């Protein structure tokens, strides 16, 4: 027997209300349905249709709908929306097939014609603005009302940078690889691509420019982006500080008084020290300095002047002269070629054809100001073609250069040289000033190579110069970019991958290779974007590393060069030759300062009463014997005993005494000069070899009185150079040196006199031609850096 209790069944009516449950009415179902939709409940397709309904009516969705929208999976939602799109397209086609009345068209056209309608080659053209994106553009044609749809993503503000292409006619197929289509006839569309601020689209990529490193010119001028200038300034600061300790202490005191912290004091002191080297003596403050000493009775001296160096000439009974090449100017150089480093494009137009319909054509292709590119693209039903295949495609864009640089040819007849000549007078103001105030400037041109300048109290000096720069201008181009200029290799300049035009001045410039600054994007069925690269100025600055930088002043360019001059000193006289020797005592005004040329500067003040007079000056050893020192300042004299006198001299190597005055009242200064005579000889030889590498054949003319010994090297090169080059053309430099040493050794050890002399002569000539520098190649020994450089 089953004693299990049965479950109580649900009553068929409500015991409290005493009434049966009823079926919901229609209004209750509608209320429940709408409430569920507003909260985002229901099937996906139904909810998305309701969301579209709200969007059409511009009704903001509820929080529940937004939450449900966020929960939809991407693939499923896209599939539903594509179904909506297909249904709407079908509805549009049905509506387009209906016959509309004239009244209906007149009502629709004003709302659709928010764009500008024109024609291109007899075909309709729409000029649309940014607001027309995604809208239906309606206009009347001979085939009926044409409705075009434009969904271009690059649609921007109207400007000169426009995009023009043809919208194909697509009726029953889904558009493929197009962002504009029409339903009645093919239509051209034009729109701007600028941003709201009017800026054009640019590509950030830079052109790959080959660096100029390794193609630089052998001059003493600093190269672009090198550290030479900084090191030279530091060396000048060090030399000036050691020479002027009093001013250095004053600068330190000023920095301590002005600055509030250690960092500020240090910065102020460094800035003061960087400025002070501008107060230096001409030639004394220049690192590259050459001394030329003429023989007794000399009436002329040959010198070679170059930028960044100074020449000091000395001759018996003649004043000591400091000569420096201030600048080399070139006026109105001819323009060889112009390069474009920044451009802009406009009026981009594209034409495309279906397969088997021939080549695409554009009128712009015949215009030299347009850059064009042809290609082939895939065409088919989805972009207005009845056949599938490759169709012809052509895009053109108008090219305009915004920033350009010029390459100019320098001609010898357009050169002008400025040479400054300063006399060593011992004036204290002359020592403390590097300006041209105390010197006389001569101007040399190829048309007037001779100049006579008057030196106050010292007569006249005639400069007979040969305007030979030492640079082969057939291989050099003067590159000018904005306010900067460089001397560059001509072939490097011509090989730069940048748009170029000829140097001839014309009203309309025609650029070649415009495509080097233009990027054609991926070609679509009816459209291709074209963008221009950004400014290449930064890339050019990087590529110019190692080039010789040139200063420009207006239309005149100042650059590195060389000048060979003959100084005719027959009209020069030495001031104070009739004065007697000073008998009084001298007082040292400043500590003896050593220059970077091995000379010393002595500043003394005369305490006697017999001025004007000549200053006795000599260099002696500890026993009082006069040594072979050299007095750079010729015939130092005292004019006014109240003014100090500066004397430059070259003491001998080792320990010596600088004696100023005579007798027991003489001022005796102990001095020690580092180095040796043999080392100086080798260093001078190496310096001459470097000058030869820089100046070429001009360097061999450096000397005085046209001496034979200075031309021996040139003579050997001219006689034996050609034969030597033919015999040893395939032999390495080390092998040439080895052969020369071997022949010399055989000559020294040979018992036969004739054979010995022959071997020694041939060995020495071979060794000389192998070591010394010719006009086109050679080797230089750097004794200070302990290295050998060949080139």
UniProtKB/Swiss-Prot annotation:
GO terms for biological process: clathrin-dependent endocytosis of virus by host cell; fusion of virus membrane with host endosome membrane; symbiont-mediated suppression of host innate immune response; virion attachment to host cell. Keywords: Capsid protein, Clathrin-mediated endocytosis of virus by host, Cleavage on pair of basic residues, Disulfide bond, Fusion of virus membrane with host endosomal membrane, Fusion of virus membrane with host membrane, Glycoprotein, Host cytoplasm, Host endoplasmic reticulum, Host membrane, Host nucleus, Host-virus interaction, Inhibition of host innate immune response by virus, Membrane, Secreted, Suppressor of RNA silencing, Transmembrane, Transmembrane helix, Viral attachment to host cell, Viral envelope protein, Viral immunoevasion, Viral nucleoprotein, Viral penetration into host cytoplasm, Virion, Virus endocytosis by host, Virus entry into host cell, Zinc. Disulfide bonds join 283-310, 340-401, 354-385, 372-396, 465-565, 582-613, 779-790. Residues 1-101, 261, 747-752 are cytoplasmic. GO terms for cellular component: extracellular region; host cell endoplasmic reticulum membrane; host cell nucleus; host cell perinuclear region of cytoplasm; membrane; viral envelope; viral nucleocapsid; virion membrane. The chain crosses the membrane at residues 102-119, 243-260, 262-280, 726-746, 753-775. Pfam families: Flavi_capsid, Flavi_E_stem, Flavi_glycop_C, Flavi_glycoprot, Flavi_M, Flavi_propep. Glycans are attached at residues 183, 347, 433. One of its GO terms (molecular function) is structural molecule activity. Residues 101-114 form a propeptide. Residues 120-242, 281-725, 776-791 are extracellular. Residues 378-391 are annotated as: Fusion peptide. Residues 37-72 are annotated as: Hydrophobic. The transmembrane domains of the small envelope protein M and envelope protein E contain an endoplasmic reticulum retention signal. This is Genome polyprotein. It comes from Dengue virus type 1 (strain Jamaica/CV1636/1977) (DENV-1).
